[in-house]
Amino acid sequence: MKLFQRDEAYGMMVRDLKTAQSVSYAVPAVLEKTLREYQKIGYTWMRTLARYHLGGILADDMGLGKTLQVIALLTAFYQEKTEQKAAGNEGSGSELPLPSLIVCPASLVYNWGQEFARFSPGIRVLLIAGTAKERQEQLEEQMRMEASEGAQVIITSYDLLKRDRAAYLGRTFEYEIIDEAQVIKNAKTQGAKAVKEISANARFALTGTPVENRLSELWSIFDFLMPGFLYSYRKFRERYELPIVKNQDPEALTALRRMTGPFVLRRLKKDVLRELPGKEERIVYSAASGRQQKLYTASALKLKEALAGGAWSGNGKLEVLSQLMRLRQICCDPALCFEDYAGESAKLETCVSLIASASAAGHKILLFSQFASMLERIQERLLQEGISSHLLVGATPKEERSRMVQAFASDEVPVFLISLKAGGTGLNLTAADIVIHYDPWWNVAAQNQATDRAYRIGQEKPVTVYKLILKDTIEENLLKLQNAKLALAAQVVSEGMVSLGDLSQNELMELFEQNP
């Protein structure tokens, strides 16, 4: 794979990028009235990079239309090639245009296809799906076709690309675009290796969180975009990661931002969507008592003793993680981990009361939890109060998922209960104006993406986000730890997350400060 070279063309490109807003690239007529001004800037930015066969990270906030900006880029490219051919002016080369490849999570493959059909129906799109034999036939047929007849855009998932990687090697694409690029944050995974093996003239990565926890994640994405630009990982770690993370070196941070800045475009909703109504976040506390408090105290003490005994640095990590999960479940509702528990859950009662008041006032509510079993308990309690709800978890069939999403926009059901992992991406639920996070999740980016199911283009009402916290527990201290960990990601590029596996023993102990 060709490594990035800092040459004269690179200097010209940087100068062009500094004046990207003044560079004139015609927006495809089919999208001229659809693209917002900031999306046109994103389109121009990508075209400027592509002109020099370079890549970048489109890191806009969730809901700002990263997909649409890419559709504009690809539509412009293939329309211009078609027009050049019709005019008999193909430049110095006679080759037909190469197809482009989009790689995304499996849950978004059909969404990409639908977006092309909606916004740029003239682009020929091939969705890779089916059995191994069917996929092989799809790709072989594509290769047999002339570029003027075959698909211009091929869309596949990370998992299928890994399985079919041999079919892609030996051919070159015009663009390779990876969606939800945080999937390749670990450079050692087969998924990361597979996308980096593809030959393409220009590459782009779409993600709202290019840095979730470690700077190595940013390095891995740049290793996909322009191998060698941030050097080898060993050199990057010595020059930037260690000085910034361990020593808070401002010079290293400034140097890294200066290097990556031209290749990362990040816009926030509050900056570009002036018409988007406000968003307010509130923390709602509950206080455990009785048996719930006793169970939490005993479990927290047991875990503190294990940590003090060095369990986190030995072979006991899995047991520590298991006990942490149990503590979180006790905060949600002790019945999640104690079958014979018949007492109250302070947070559940607070939650039901909040939903009852909101639904009575005519609001529609999204509620997210990591635990599907907790969502089922909430649904049962709501039924006791005469409140109906939809429930979406990982096991929900795709057809039922689509039906519920469509129904929620128009039916009288006021509550949509969604597991965090099942509903974090690919849903548009702007009918809701209240979002409840029942339990704090280590991954703040996932929580924010969940909130953006409601707070996005199309939302006409102010949105209120409630985070439910059990006071004087691990949940309360987790919020403090998240803020500290997020600071690094915010300094470099974006928002971030806390990964339990990355915490030191001292940081784990801090989760229990001022708690039993």
Model-derived features with residue positions:
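Long, charge-dense, solvent-exposed interaction surfaces that engage phosphate-rich ligands
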Residues: 253-255
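ASCE P-loop NTPase motor core, strongest for the SF2 helicase catalytic module
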Residues: 3-248, 257-516
